[in-house]
Amino acid sequence: MKDLLNLLKNQGQIEEFDAIRIGLASPEMIRSWSFGEVKKPETINYRTFKPERDGLFCAKIFGPVKDYECLCGKYKRLKHRGVICEKCGVEVALAKVRRERMGHIELASPVAHIWFLKSLPSRIGLLLDMTLRDIERVLYFESYVVIDPGMTTLEKGQLLNDEQYFEALEEFGDDFDARMGAEAVHELLNAIDLEHEIGRLREEIPQTNSETKIKKLSKRLKLMEAFQGSGNKPEWMVLTVLPVLPPDLRPLVPLDGGRFATSDLNDLYRRVINRNNRLKRLLDLAAPDIIVRNEKRMLQEAVDALLDNGRRGRAITGSNKRPLKSLADMIKGKQGRFRQNLLGKRVDYSGRSVITVGPTLRLHQCGLPKKMALELFKPFIFGKLEGRGMATTIKAAKKMVERELPEVWDVLAEVIREHPVLLNRAPTLHRLGIQAFEPVLIEGKAIQLHPLVCAAYNADFDGDQMAVHVPLTLEAQLEARALMMSTNNILSPANGEPIIVPSQDVVMGLYYMTREAINAKGEGMAFADLQEVDRAYRSGQASLHARVKVRINEKVKGEDGQLTANTRIVDTTVGRALLFQVVPAGLPFDVVNQSMKKKAISKLINHCYRVVGLKDTVIFADQLMYTGFAYSTISGVSIGVNDFVIPDEKARIINAATDEVKEIESQYASGLVTQGEKYNKVIDLWSKANDEVSKAMMANLSKEKVVDREGKEVDQESFNSMYMMADSGARGSAAQIRQLAGMRGLMAKPDGSIIETPITANFREGLNVLQYFISTHGARKGLADTALKTANSGYLTRRLVDVAQDLVVTEIDCGTEHGLLMSPHIEGGDVVEPLGERVLGRVIARDVFKPGSDEVIVPAGTLIDEKWVDFLEVMSVDEVVVRSPITCETRHGICAMCYGRDLARGHRVNIGEAVGVIAAQSIGEPGTQLTMRTFHIGGAASRTSAADNVQVKNGGTIRLHNLKHVVRADGALVAVSRSGELAVADDFGRERERYKLPYGAVISVKEGDKVDPGAIVAKWDPHTHPIVTEVDGTVAFVGMEEGITVKRQTDELTGLTNIEVMDPKDRPAAGKDIRPAVKLIDAAGKDLLLPGTDVPAQYFLPANALVNLTDGAKVSIGDVVARIPQETSKTRDITGGLPRVADLFEARRPKEPSILAEISGTISFGKETKGKRRLVITPNDGSDPYEELIPKWRHLNVFEGEQVNRGEVISDGPSNPHDILRLLGVSSLAKYIVNEIQDVYRLQGVKINDKHIETILRQMLRKVEVSESGDSSFIKGDQVELTQVLEENEQLGTEDKFPAKYERVLLGITKASLSTESFISAASFQETTRVLTEAAVTGKRDFLRGLKENVVVGRLIPAGTGLAYHSERKRQRDLGKPQRVSASEAEAALTEALNSSGN
C-alpha cells in the first residue's frame, strides 16, 4: 500500500524545455495562477493552530494542511481525492500543494512596481519620457499629471502642483483630465501607442545633432522595441493585482512557549492587506480626498517594501529593529536563492576529518578511517548484507552495522574495493582541489593523504581538514576514475608542468644521495653492475657520496619510440647509481647523473611523462618519494646555531658603506646633491652592501676545505645543513639565509618608503631593541596583507569564472587564418621567455619559412610539441604566427585548433573541455601568492640599485630601434626619444638581448658596431631626468620670473643656488599661465630652429625642474639644459600584484594615461587655451587635421614638426588598453595585456600559460559598438555581441544589402559577465535586481548555453561528459523527436565521448 501511495506522490510531470523566458505578468495572468483571493491579514488561529479562512494561510485557497484530509475533518483518506468539502471548502489533496498554489490580492488602487520605477535607468520614466523625480511626485501624491489635455493649452504629461491644478480647473473646467497617484501613471502607460512612437523616434534620430540627445533617444527606442518585441504591455509595470506566495514557502512555525517563528514575508503581506482593506473601506465611505490619498500612498509603500524593502526610503523593520527580508532579498546576494541554493548545494554521503601524512600510500590511494567509511558506505553495506542473505531485512542489516559485527567489516572491505572517493580541500581554487582516490581502510580518525598531491591541494599537515565525497552512480564512479583520479592529474592545467613534484624531505633526501664528496670512502672503485654497487654500499665498503665507475645497461627510447639497449661505463657516485634503479626503462642514465635539486627533479618527471607515458611516470613518482624519504632519514640533516657561518668580510663591507654614506651626507651638506638624490644614493649604497654581504656569506657557506686522496687541500661544495636545504630547494632561500647569517638589510616604514638606516645585524647575532622595533612593522603588515589578499584573490577568481564560464571547445577547426605573432619576450638584457616556451602546445597559423629563404619548414596547422620546439631553435626562427583563442572564429565556444594543447593532458584539447573555467582557475589560483602592495618608485625594500648603464651580456652586433638621437661634440650619441631600444644580435641575426634607452642616455656605440661581452654601451643618471639641447647656441630664459614662476633655491647648508620651477598650483595668480622655458638663440639674438624643422628651439620646463645654467650661457649639442629630479617628477605608484591584475582584467582606464597619436601625420601646436595646449596632427594625405587639448603639466615627448604614426606615444604615462585597441588593433592589445599580466605573475615566480589570459581576453572582446547601421536592425552606438553582428551581416550579404560596420569594444570582466546573453548567469553573478528587471522588460529568452544556467536549472552542463547529452538532445530536436534522451542513448553517447577523449 505504501508503495502505491509513493507512486501517487511522485506523479510530478517533468517539464521539457529548451529555453527559459522571463517577462512581465499581466493582471489576468496573475489571476489565472491564483487559487483565490486573500482578503484578511490573519494567519492562523493561535488556539487551534488551524489556518484562518481567507487569511494568508487559508486552506481553502492554498490546500489542506494534512495529506488527503480537509480542514474540518469530514473527508479523510485517499478515496476522497479531489473532493471539495462543502463545509470548509477545502479540496482533499496532498499537503504538498501548499508549496505550489498561489493566491492574489485585488488592490483597491493600482501600485507601481518598484523595480521598474527605481531600478536605474527607470523603465517607467524612459517610456513616459519623464524624470524619476517627477514620476515619484505623481506616485506619492505631491503633483497632478495631465493625462488628456483635451482642447486646452496644457500638455500631456505636464506636472501641476495643487495651485496650478486649481487654476487650470477654474480656467478650463472639465476640458482636461489630470490625476495623481499610480492610476495616473497607469493611464499614461496604457495610452502609449508603441508602433507610432517607434516610427517617430526612428525618424527623429537621424535628424538630431547632439550626441547626448541621440543617446537618450536610442535608449528610449530600444526600450520601446523591447516592449513591442516581447509582447509585454507597458501598463503591466503598474500592478493592479498582487500575487501571494504559496504559504509553505513563507512558513509560520510554532515554537515552544506559544510563540511563533515566521518568515518576514508574512509581516510584509499583512501590512499590504491591512492597508488595502482600509483603503477599500475608505473608498466605500467616500472619505475626504486627503485621507484616501494618504492611504494610497501607504499602500504603495507597503507593496514597495514587500517587493524590495529598503529600495525606497527607510527599510521597514520588524519587532527586533532588523530590516525585513523582502522578495528581492530572497534572491540576491551570497545568501540568496541563486548562490546559496542553486549554484551551491550541500550534498549527502560526505564527511570531513583532519589529514595526516600517508608516506606508504601509492599515488592513487588515500587512507580512510574505518568509522568514516562505515558511515559513508552504509546503503551499499545494507544492500550487500541483504543480498548475501546475512540479514533478512534492511532493518536487521542496520542493527548489524550499528553493532559493528565482524562480518560487517568484511563486507565493507568488499564494497570499498575499487570504489573511488573524492577528496576536497577548501578553498577549492582550481580543479585539482578535488581529486579521486581509492580508499584504504585505516584505524584512527584522521584521513591519510599521499604527500605528492599536497602541492595540488596546497595542503599541509598542521591541522588542515578535508572532505570526502562518495560518487554513487556507475557513471559518477566512471568519471571519477577516468578523469579525476590523482594519477590522471600529473600535469598542472595552468602551465603544463608536473604538479606531482616532490618537495621538502623528499627533495632533501634525493639531493643528499646524489651529491658527491671528495675522498669519500670507496672513491675510485669500479663496479660491474648496479647490484654490485648496492652490495658495496650496504656492506659499508663505499660511502653514498663516493665517486666510482659503474658499468650500466640503459634502455633508451629513440625517435621511433623503440627501446634500444645500451651498455657503457660511466663516472658517477654510489648514490646516483642507486637512484638509477628506480628510473623506468626508456630514460638514459644522464638524467640522474647530477645532484638532484628541486628543479632537476621537476624536469625529470616532466621528461619522464613525455617519454614513457603516464603509467610509468606515476610508478616512478612513487618510487622517487619512497627513496627520498628513506635517504633523508639516513642523512640526518638538521640545523644548529653553528651552521650559520657569518662571513669575516661583513664588518669590512659595512664599515666601507658607512664611510660612503658619510661622504654623501657631506656632499648634501655642501649642496652638491638634493635631499631626494641623497636618499636615493644612500639606499642604493646599502642595497649594494647588502648584496655584497650576502655574496660573501654564500661564498663562505657554499665551499668547505677538504683533503683529497693525494693529501692536497681542495675546495668542495659544502655539506653545511642550512646550505644544502636552500641549495636543493627543500626549504629556505638565499634571501632567508642572508637574514640568518648575513645582514637583515633595509626595512620599509608603514607607508612603504624605505628607512635609510638598514639593520646591519642578523638573527644569529641577534637584534637590539631598535632593530627589533623596525622589524615588527614588516611582520605585522605581512599578516594583515595575507587576510586581505585571500578575499581579494577569491573575488577575482569569481569574476573570472563568471566571465568565462560558457567558453567550451565546441568544434575541431574554425578554419581561420588569423593568429597572433609570437616572438621571444625580451626584457632588460634577458630573454625572459624564449620563443619555444611561448609557442609550445600551439597550432601554427601560417607556414613558417626558413630564415633568409622561402622554404617552408613548418606547415600551417602543425601542433608544436617539444620536438618541433627544438627544431625551431636549431633553425633559429625568430617569430611565428600561432592560432589563438582571441582570433578564433567559432560562433559559440572555441575550436580545438585555436586553443591547441590541453596542458593537463599533453595532447590536442578534446571537444567539450571547459577551457574558460580552466583559464579562470589557472589565473585566479595563484592570486593568493601575489602581493597586495602598490609600490612607489623606490618602494620595495628588496629594490635593486637603480640601473644607470647598459652592459651587454653576449657579444654581437648592435641594433638601435626607433631611437632619435643627436651627436655630441665628442662623437657620442645622446638619446632624445623615450621609446628607443638597443638590441644585440648574434651571428645568425637572432636578437639575444634588448634594452630600453631612457631620454638623455649617452650611447657610445653606433648601429652595426660589433661589441664584446660585458662592454658598457650606454650610460645615464638614474636619479634625474635631463632635458637635452639639439642645437648649439646661447641660453635665453623665457617666462622665468623669480617669485612668480621660479624660485631661486639656496641650499641652507651650502649657499649654492639653483633655479627651481614652481608647481603651477603654488604660483601667485600672475604666474599661473606662464610657461617658463629655456630657448636657444644665435649670436645675433635670433631664435635657433630645431634641426630639420621651422620650430624654434625652446624647451618648456615642467614643474620642479632644476636649472643650473645662467641666462646667456653657451651650450653645445647634447648638453643638459635642465634636470628634473626623478623622485619629484610625479612618483607614479607602480600598482603591483593582485590589484594590478584586477585593473587589467577590469580594463580600467588609468588616472593619467599615456596620450597616443590618433592619426599619422605631422605635429604642430595650435592656439593655447586656459591651462591646456592644443596639439594638432596634420595627416600627410591632406585629409582633415586632428586636434586635441592636452593639460599643460603633461610632459610631451614630441616637438613641433615631428612625424608620428597612429598609436605612437605622445605623452608618457600608464597605457590605456581601450586606446591600444582603438588605435593599434586586437593583436597589439592582446600582446600588451598578456605581457603586463605575465610580468606580475613572473615577479612571484608563478608560471601561467599565455593562452589562459587570451581566453579571458576573448570574453572581454565579445561586444562591438555599431558605428554605421547600414541596412541592419542595429542602431548606431549600440553595443552588440560580435556573433550577432556577424550573423546579421552574413544574412544581409546574401540579400545584397549594406552590412553594419562596427568597432571592437573592450569590456572589463565584471561588465562582460553582466552583459552576457544569459540572464540567469548574469543575475546569479551581481546586481541581480538590475539584471532581472532588464530581462523582464525585454522579455529575454535564456537558451541555457553556458554552464551556470544549466547548473541552476539542474541539468548536466554542456561541457565534458555532459556535452554528449546536450548534443544528443540537439540532434533529436533537429529530427523533430520528443526530447527525452533515454538512459541507454545517453550512456552510448557518453562512452563514445570518453573513448574519443582517451585517444
Swiss-Prot record:
One of its GO terms (biological process) is DNA-templated transcription. It is an enzyme of class 2 (transferase). Residues 1367-1399 are annotated as: Disordered. InterPro entries: DNA-dir_RpoC_beta_prime, DNA-dir_RpoC_beta_prime_bact, RNA_pol_asu, RNA_pol_N, RNA_pol_Rpb1_1, RNA_pol_Rpb1_3, RNA_pol_Rpb1_3_sf, RNA_pol_Rpb1_4. Mg(2+) binds at residues 460, 462, 464. Residues 1382-1399 have a biased composition (Low complexity). DNA-dependent RNA polymerase catalyzes the transcription of DNA into RNA using the four ribonucleoside triphosphates as substrates. Belongs to the RNA polymerase beta' chain family. This is DNA-directed RNA polymerase subunit beta'. It comes from Pseudomonas paraeruginosa (strain DSM 24068 / PA7) (Pseudomonas aeruginosa (strain PA7)). The lineage of its organism: Bacteria, Pseudomonadati, Pseudomonadota, Gammaproteobacteria, Pseudomonadales. The gene is rpoC.
